[in-house]
Each structure stands twice: as C-alpha cells, then as structure tokens.
Amino acid sequence: MDKKINLDYLIDDIIVNSDDLTPFQCQICFNSVIDFKKETLSFDVLQCRNGHISCHECWNRQLSIKQECPSCKVKTLPSELSRNIFLENAFRALKVICPNKFKESKFQGEAVHCENGCPEILKVELLEHHLKECQYQFIKCPNNSNKCKYIIRKNQIEHHNQSVCDYSLIQCEKCSELIERKKLNKHIESECDTLMITCSKCSASIGKKLMNHHLETDCPMEEISCLYKAGGCNKRFLRSQLSQHLSENNNHIFYIQNVMDLHKLQLDECNQDYRKLEKQNRDLEKRLFYLESTVNSTVINSKPHECGGGGGGGSGNNVYKGKWVINNWDRKLREYPISKSLNSPFFQIGSSKFFIMLYPNGNNEVKGFLSIFLYKIYDRPSLVKYSLEAKNIDPTKNYKNTHTNNFINNNGNGWFKWIENKSQNGFFSNNSLTISISIKIIQDHSLVTE
C-alpha cells in the first residue's frame, strides 16, 4: 500500500485570492476560522448570539476563562454557540489550488510552488475528495521503506521503479530471478544459475545451476563408492575407473550374489508383513460387516415375551422367540454381493449365544435365492430345534423352515436355497425383510468330571 505523506499547509497558502479570506478571520487570533490542520475538514463557523465569530480554538480558550463574547461582551455559554450557515456556505465556495502544487517541504516557513505539481484549481468543498485521488500527492517509495528513503509523487512511481530506485526488483534476463537493481550486476557476474563455471575436479565448463548434478552423476574425476557396496565391496575410486573396478574379482559375482540375497531377504520380510496385514484386514472386514449389520442395518424385536437381550423368553430358559427386521433391503442387495454375509445381533438362550447369518444374494453358486444359517457360538454340544420364517405381505404365503441339528462346533446350519430375492414376491414390502425366529434347546450335552 502507498504510504501517503501529509503536507503541512494553511488556507492562506492555497487560497487563490487572499482578499477572499477577510470575512472569515477570527476576531481574536486573526487566522481563518476554519481549521485546516485536521485530517478531515470541518466547515463549522461558530458565533455568539450577536453574530461575532472566532475559531474553535479561541472560543474554547476564551469561554474556559470567562463566559462572554470577546467582541461584544454578551454572556455566552459553550452550549449557546450557534453555526453561521451563510459563512460556512460562502467558505465552501472559495477557490483554492491543490496543496500538491507545492514542493514536499516548506522553505523558511513558506510553501514553494513546483512546476511538476498538481495544476488543479477547485472549490474548498471539493478539496478533501480530490486529495484522496490526486496523482501528485507525495508517497514513500514502496520497494523497501527501510532502505530507500525517496519521497516521490504518486504519478512518478513507475519512472522511479524503472530508472532510479536501487531497491526495485529487476528480472534477470538469463535466469528470470527477481533481483534488487543495486545487486543485479553482482548477480550476473558471480551468482546467476546460468553462469558457466569450471568444475574443480575435471575442469569441464558447467552451468552453475547444474554443477551439483554434474558432480553427483557425471564428473569422471569425482570419487564414488562401488555400485555393490550393499553386497560388501567398500572400495572408493574415480567415476572414470568404474568399468575397470567392476571387472575385478570375477566381475563382482560374489558381491552381486550378496545384494541378491539381501533383496530376497527383504522381499521375504515384505511378503510376511503383507500376509500379516492381509489377515488383519480380513479380520477387520468381518468385524465391520458385523457392526454394520447390528448397528446400522438391523432391528431386533425386544418385547419381553419374545426374549430381549437377557435370559430368553417363551416357556423357559431353553426357548427363544423373536424376529429380525432388516430395513433398506435394496441397499443390502447392492452392498452384499454373492457370498458376502449380513449377520444379525447376538441373542442368548441361557448361557448359549446364537446369531443368524444371511446372504442377500446367496452363498457360493446359489444365485437368485437368499441363503440363511443359524450359528451357535460353541461352548458345549447342544441339540437344537429351530425354525426361521420369512414374513409375507400375505400371511398365507409366509415361508417357514424347521430343522433339528446337533451343534458340536462353530459351524452353522440352515438352507443354501431359502426364498427368492425378487422384490415382487411379497417378502420385501416397504423395502424391508422380517424373519421370525423360534429356537428351543432340546438337550445340552454337559461335560462332568468327578
């Protein structure tokens, strides 16, 4: 941002005709009643009840000493001063020259006209707006205010930048870097990246910017390590001797083999890490599928007579009756392709935990049908009779399967081909599927040690 320089001037310095100021003289100090020292001009002209005027400063000083008009001695309080609108309007119409017509500083207390200054003559009331836009106002050099002390007119800044200021940024014609004008010659002679310099190792002429790359990859006289240092060869030699060095020791076969063995070891470690991460990923996916099905995707009926989360319902602790409601069925078909299962929340009969595993698009090679299985978290062998019933919008078409199975491990039991997953068959009304669950543990095979 341009740093504007505020000029020191009075109305007497800029008035076109000095006689025009006579009606506006303060009766005490004889200066103008308008204060031109303020940043924002105030045109208020204050008078006593008899019409005598003074500047604001003199009114304040006079009334603090004695509350009377210094001209007519009439009693006057600060609150009784009134504005002289006629004089205010007359003052606004006075013609003045732009203060930027003068040089930056006065000479022996007098404003000095400058031939390069602003030629504008305008009314007093337009002066404040003009000064904000005037291209002849003085500003500090914007390039480096801590170094360049130049104060210039705003309309000369371009010339100052291009021809005068030592701190303006000039683009180097060779490397395009922006450099201060005073440093440009030194930059071109000794610092520019495109400067051709001599390599201290091989005496080749190389661009300064490319010297590091030359030493790292090309210079024949640069000392380097063997390509097979990782294989045990620790010799150093000039780059120009690389071919000769590699031909030694039976063409470095021993060191090459060491490098290959090292790479094989690293590859084996990577494979082990990969298999470990792959297993962790599978485990996490299983947990995620279960959480999705239990938290976001399913509803378990929790009426007391249908066995909530506690010790079972129905006729005793060996019986469970409930239902599993699966909402957003169309989304489940998309999210669970063939062989991907959706699991119900756990439910409990006595101390035994169960859950339902459902395949919306079928398991293995079964397509077009739902696959459904009952799983028992294995604690001890149990003979279980269970039924799973798909509820239809027409109750006469409900589909129920019943089976008795001896659960002796963690494997599930159920039907690969259960109901068709057609949206029009009445099982998926309101985009949801409801499965009634009935389970009875006929016999627990407890292990007893005496």
Curated annotation (Swiss-Prot):
Which of UniProt's keywords are assigned here?
Answer: Coiled coil, Cytoplasm, Metal-binding, Repeat, Zinc, Zinc-finger
Q: Where in the cell is it found?
A: Cytoplasm
**Entry GO MF terms:** zinc ion binding
Where does the MATH domain start and stop, copy by copy? 319-439
Residue spans annotated as Zn fingers (TRAF-type) read: 129-185, 186-243
Predominant localisation class: cytoplasm
Domain of life assignment: Eukaryota
Record-linked InterPro entries: MATH/TRAF_dom, TRAF-like, Znf_RING/FYVE/PHD, Znf_TRAF
ZnF region ranges: RING-type = 26-73
Pfam families assigned: MATH_2 (PF22486), zf-TRAF (PF02176)
CDD domains recorded: MATH
A single GO CC term, please?
cytoplasm
**Coiled-coil residues:** 257-297
Q: Which PROSITE patterns match?
A: MATH (PS50144), ZF_TRAF (PS50145)
Q: What is known of its domains?
A: The MATH/TRAF domain binds to receptor cytoplasmic domains.
The family database entries (PANTHER family) matched by this protein are listed as: TNF RECEPTOR ASSOCIATED FACTOR (PTHR10131), TNF RECEPTOR-ASSOCIATED FACTOR FAMILY PROTEIN DDB_G0273433_DDB_G0273509 (PTHR10131:SF141)
Q: Which family does it belong to?
A: Belongs to the TNF receptor-associated factor family. A subfamily.
Q: What does this protein do?
A: Probable adapter protein and signal transducer that links members of the tumor necrosis factor receptor family to different signaling pathways by association with the receptor cytoplasmic domain and kinases.
What name does this protein carry? Answer: TNF receptor-associated factor family protein DDB_G0273433/DDB_G0273509
Name the source organism. Dictyostelium discoideum
